[in-house]
Swiss-Prot record:
It catalyses: a quinone + NADH + 5 H(+)(in) = a quinol + NAD(+) + 4 H(+)(out). This is NADH-quinone oxidoreductase subunit I. Keywords: 4Fe-4S, Cell inner membrane, Cell membrane, Iron, Iron-sulfur, Membrane, Metal-binding, NAD, Quinone, Repeat, Translocase, Ubiquinone. Belongs to the complex I 23 kDa subunit family. It is a peripheral membrane protein. The lineage of its organism: Bacteria, Pseudomonadati, Thermodesulfobacteriota, Desulfuromonadia, Desulfuromonadales. Coiled coil: none annotated.
Length: 186
């Protein structure tokens, strides 16, 4: 036996057919389609596919996170102390650090022997920058051309991360960046 509820809405035949809702949905879809079609016919920008190599996106947010940078100390060595906090907090597991001991330096007994970031896995979340206790890793605001045809070019080594200078970044000055700004691609 089917239960009857006291607050059950009663629907007549017109409500159960949903004709009004179907027509309303078709009107919304049609208006968006024909609006975009009109923009396309009049050579204005509509909600169409951007053809990547020919059309580059220029409307990035001011809070955009770009390529990673390793800061350096006054003596030219990397500021990283190989604590692995950035690699631990990374949700994509794209940072690989291999530590080396330097017993001659009493203030920085550990330094990275190998520091690499796999950009094919990086999601540019910025957690590594927030987790670093030494402010050794930063992210530029530039949007360099990342896509490539092989995965070897998607790995950023320690030398590249230390020597790559962003073309423009008004957020902070970078320690040890007395050179002219130049862009170095992997």
């Amino acid at each position: 036996m089917k239960k009857e509820y006291w607050n059950k809405p009663t629907m007549d035949l017109w409500d159960r057919l949903y004709i009004f809702e179907v027509i309303r949905g078709l009107c919304i879809t049609g208006s968006v389609f024909f609006g975009n079609m009109w923009k396309w016919l009049t050579f204005r920008k509509g909600a169409l596919t951007a053809y990547y190599p020919e059309e580059l996106r220029a409307d990035y947010s001011s809070a955009n996170r770009g390529r990673h940078l390793l800061t350096t100390r006054a003596d030219g060595k990397v500021q990283c102390v190989s604590c692995n906090m950035c690699a631990t907090v990374c949700p994509a597991y794209c940072i690989e650090i291999q530590s080396a001991a330097d017993f001659n330096d009493p203030f920085h007994p550990k330094s990275p022997d190998r520091f690499e970031i796999d950009y094919s896995r990086c999601i540019f979340c910025g957690f590594c920058v927030e987790a670093c206790p030494e402010d050794a890793i930063r992210m530029s605001k530039d949007t360099p051309n990342f896509p490539g045809f092989d995965r070897e070019n998607m790995w950023a080594t320690q030398d590249l991360l230390m020597n790559w200078q962003p073309a423009s970044d008004a957020a902070k000055s970078y320690p040890g960046s007395g050179q002219a700004h130049q862009e170095v691609h992997p």
